[in-house]
Structures are given as C-alpha cells and as structure tokens.
Amino acid sequence: MVRGSNIFRSRYFLAGILLQLVAVFAVQAQKTAKKDTTIILLNDLTVQLQCSQALNDLYNFKFEKAEDNFRSLKQQYRWHPLPYFLMGLIEWWKIMPNTKDTSHDKQFLAYMDSTITIADNLYENYPEYKIEASFFLSAAYGFKGRLYSDEERRNWTKAASSGKDALDYLEESKTKQDLSPELLFGDALFNYFSVWVPENYPALKMILWMFPKGDKALGLKQLKEVSYNAFYTRTEAMVWLMRILNSYENDQPRAFDISRYLHETYPDNPFFHRYYARILYSMGRFTVAEPVCLNILERIDSAQLGYEATSGRYAAFFLGQIYEARKRPEDAKKYYKQCVKFANEIDADESGYALYSLIALGEIAEKEGNKAEAKKYFKEVKKKSGRKDEAFKTAKQRLKKLEKGD
C-alpha cells in the first residue's frame, strides 16, 4: 500500500477548493412571488436531447464529435452563453489528464471570455434571462479561477479576481431557489467546503470569515441530488462527490461505486480510468487493479487521446506495488522504473509516486545484496525530496542502516 497518505496531494489543490466555493455553476435558485417569467434554456428538453450525445462524447474524450454538435447548437443559440460554455468545457477536459500541459489554456480562456461577454449582455439587457446569465457568469469566472490557481499557472492575482467575480454573482442570486437541479451544484460545493476548509486548515478561518456559514451534511445531500437529477452538471457533480467521499468522508465503498460507474460509462476518459485504478489499488483489490493498470499502459503505448505520462505514472506505480506484494521483484522493478521514467517526462520527479518508486527500487536492491545500487537509489531520493518529507526521512534511515553494515 502507499506509504504516507498525503504525499500525492498537490499543495495547490486547496486553492482550487477555495475558488470552487464560489465558482463551478455557483448560482442558487429563484423563489418567485408572482407568475414566473424567467426563461431557462438549461431546462429546455429539446436542447437537452440535442446535447445528450454530445455530453457523452465530451466525457468519453470524443472531442471532435462533441464539438460538431456544440457548433450546431451555437448556430441556433449564438446569442446564448450555453454553447460557448460547453465548447470551453471540452477544452477543460483536454487539460484534465495532465494539468502541466498549458497548450489548451488560450482556447479555454477564449471560450470562457465569450461566455462571460454573452452572459453579461443577457444579464444587463434581458431580465427574463438574468438568473441563467448569472449561472454562466459565475461558472465561467469560476473555471477561469480554477485554471489560474493551478500549480502550473499560479497566477494568484487573476485567480483572486476571477474568484471575486464568481462570488459577486453568487451573492446576486443567494436568495433564489427551486429553479433547476443544475443550480444546486454551486450551493452544494459551497455548503460543504466552506465548513471543511476551516475545519482542516484553521489558519484560513480569517480568510473565510466573510463567507456565509455552510452546512457539510446539506452540501453532501445537495451534491447527491445533483448527481441523480441534473442534466448538464450531473457528471461534474459525480466527480466531486467521488473525490469528497474518497478523500474526506471516509466512504471509500461509495466512492468506488461512483468511480466504477464513471469508468464503465466513459471508458475512454483517462482521468476516470486512472481514478478507478487508484481506488482499486488503495482498497487492496489487486486482482482487479492489475488488468486495469495494464490497460492504461497499453493505451499510452498506442497513443490514445488523453493517455500520457501522468496516467502512466499512476498505473506503473500501482503495478510495481502489486508485483512487489506478490514477491515478483523483477516485474516490480520493471514498473517502478517505468513510473520514474513517466515522472521525469512530465517534470514530476519530486512527486510521491517517483520518490517511493525509487525507495522501493532501493529496498529491492538491498534485499538482493546490491548495496551500491541501493545506496544510489536512496541518495537520489534525498536529492529530490525536501528534508521534512517522509520520503527523505525514509531514505536517510535506509542509508544509515546500509552504512552501518559496511
């Protein structure tokens, strides 16, 4: 099993969560005292039918098919932000497998800016579309904030500005409710993380004092409702629910169910594929995890869209652990070395997967009586890790033990 449960978490993930509080689809619903004249294209069944297969194609990484459908939608509704936002969502999922790749940033931001421009026109000039315009304004600003806060971008000024804009539209619609299950998504994330963040990071309480009080239990309930009943936000809600249940709520069985569903429903999505492999591995279900991981590596070898070194690093490490547990050191070494190779390809040689692969290689070399090779691996870990890292401490102890034996 993985040693050190926190070693694989990006320290910038928290920043993404904070932006997410006021970001993704963060518009709450509307309560009306008179006959409702609000128009919601999101609720239009004809449009939903038109988008259904395209959304499936999007999440299954059939981007060209999805783009063709969304372009057709844009021809019909070029005055509405929906098609531009969906085109931007395609670019977002091109980024998701490897956030170190910035080649899609420009196009993604262009679509989000178009969404904002068109939604702002509706917001300012067409009262019947004001609620839906707020939805897209908050969503677009939120996604921009998430991108800017990513580890590879770290543009905190733009991230903060986008987060503030998203918050403004959240505040605009705070008193409104019961319009659409789509619009519960932002409220769900806010309710959950506005409580979770200060509970787990007390130092951030001062930053969050201006936020309304959330409710974690309600947030989870709302997130489940969106994952069951929404159309456009359903899959995004399931992704967040899976991650929350797995990482924060100690409900791995339920997270596993969602992960398996997402992988089986969208088998060509590399993010869902590797997350499924990750949960299988962490649950110790090695018999099932082995072919899943091997399939990831096969897809990388065949250059399948979205399958690259990030997914390979996961799969190779898990296979190394599986074969080491089965006392097959040669196979274990093969995949640990492959994990390190993948990590080097994406400049992630200081990541937990790479460091613990090196430690495992050193331990195997030590068991085989090759002290020189073992020392080489442990020294490499010390060189690439911080002094406070568990990997550094482990490598230091191993080296000390080896030196005593000389």
Tell where the protein language model's regions lie, with residue ranges:
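"A position-specific structural signal for the A-helix of alpha-solenoid helical repeats
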Residues: 52, 86, 93, 136, ...
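Short coil/linker segments at helix-helix boundaries
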Residues: 33, 38, 43-49, 57-67, ...
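Short coil turns that delineate tetratricopeptide repeat
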Residues: 78, 127-128, 178-179, 231-232, ...
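Structural signature of alpha-solenoid helical repeat scaffolds
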Residues: 41-42, 75, 125, 175, ...
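Structural motif corresponding to the intra-repeat A-B loop/turn of tetratricopeptide repeats
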Residues: 60, 94, 144, 194, ...
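Amphipathic alpha-helical segments of tetratricopeptide repeats
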Residues: 75, 167-168, 227-228, 260, ...
